[in-house]
Amino acid sequence: MAEITHRFIQSNGIRMRIAEAGKGPLVVLCHGFPESWYSWRHQIPVLADAGYHVVAPDQRGYGGTDAPPDVESYTQMHLVGDIVGLVHALGEEQAVIIGHDWGAPVAWNSALWRPDIFRGVACLSVPLSPRGPISPLTAMKQTFGDNFFYILYFQTPGVAEHELQHDVRRTMRAFLHGASGSAPDPTPERLANPLKKHAFFLEQLQDSETLPAWLTEADLDYFTEEFTRSGFRGPLNWYRNFDRTWALSGPFQGQKLRQPSMFVSGDRDLIRMNPGYEAQMREVATDLREIVIIPGVGHWTQQEAPAATNDALLRFLRGLDG
C-alpha cells in the first residue's frame, strides 16, 4: 500500500498543506466540512497504487493550510484559484478533480471555469446545479423565513464558532454520526426546524456516544485535534460567501460542463434528497457518465463506504485513461 506523505505548497497567495502518494496522472481530492485531507485516508493509497499521483490538500481555512482573516477571502473564486495554483505548483498542466461536500462545488466549478486544466470531475454528495436566478441566501430566506436553517445560522461571524468550538470532540462526533447512514431518520428537516426560530445547530443532529462502525476513536481524535488547533472560523467563512460567489459568477451563467463527469452519493444522504437533482445535473453536464447511489450510506460517502467509493472512482478514472 502506497505511503502517504505530507508537505507544504505555496498556491494563490497562501500556504497549503497537502497529503500525497503515488506517481502518474494527477488526481486532486477536495474535502468537505468539517473535514480535512484525512477524510480521503481510504482513497489516497488505493488510487496511488492504481497508478495515479494523488494529492489531497487541507483547503483554505482548514488544518495546516493558511486561514486568511477576511470573510471575503473565501469565495469560490479564491477556492478554485487555490486548486489551480496547486496544480501549477506541482508542475502539472492537467488534473482530474474529485470533491466531497463543500469540496464538490470547488471541483464542479474548477471544471466549469478551467476546462483547460481539469480533464474530468467526480463529486460525492453534492450534485451539480445551474446558477439560480436569485442569490442563494435570498432563496433560502424565502423558503425558511424566520425559522431555523443551518446555513442561515452560519452567516453571522462568531455565533456558530462559539457553539462548535465549545466542545470540539462532541461537535465532531455529532457531525460524523448525525449525518451518517448510521443515524435514524435521514431527512432534510434535521437541518431545518420549522418549529424553532431560535435554535442551536448541534440540536438538529442526532449525537451518540457510540461511534458508527466506520469511524474509530483514533479517527475522531484526529479530527478533534485538527479543529481544536485551527478552529471553525475559516471553514464557516465558506458559508458566508454564497451571495458573493453568486454575484461574481454571473459571467459563467449558462456555462456547460463538457468534460467527463460522475456523481456518487449514499441513499441516506440528506444533502442529495432533491428529487430533481439528476435533471439539474444533466442540464449542465453534457458528459455525465454515471450516477452511483450506495445503499445504506449517509453524507460521509468515502468514509462510510470506502470500497464502493474506490471502485466507482477507479472505474471513472480508468474510463478517462483507457
Model-found features: residue ranges?
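Catalytic active-site module of serine/aspartate enzymes centered on a nucleophile-bearing elbow/loop
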Residues: D287-G322
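Short acidic-hydrophobic surface loop/beta-edge motif
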Residues: T5-S11
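Glycine-rich phosphate-binding loop signature in dinucleotide/nucleotide-binding domains
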Residues: G22, L90-E93, L320
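Signature tryptophan residues that serve as conserved aromatic anchors
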Residues: F33, W37-W40, W102, W108, ...
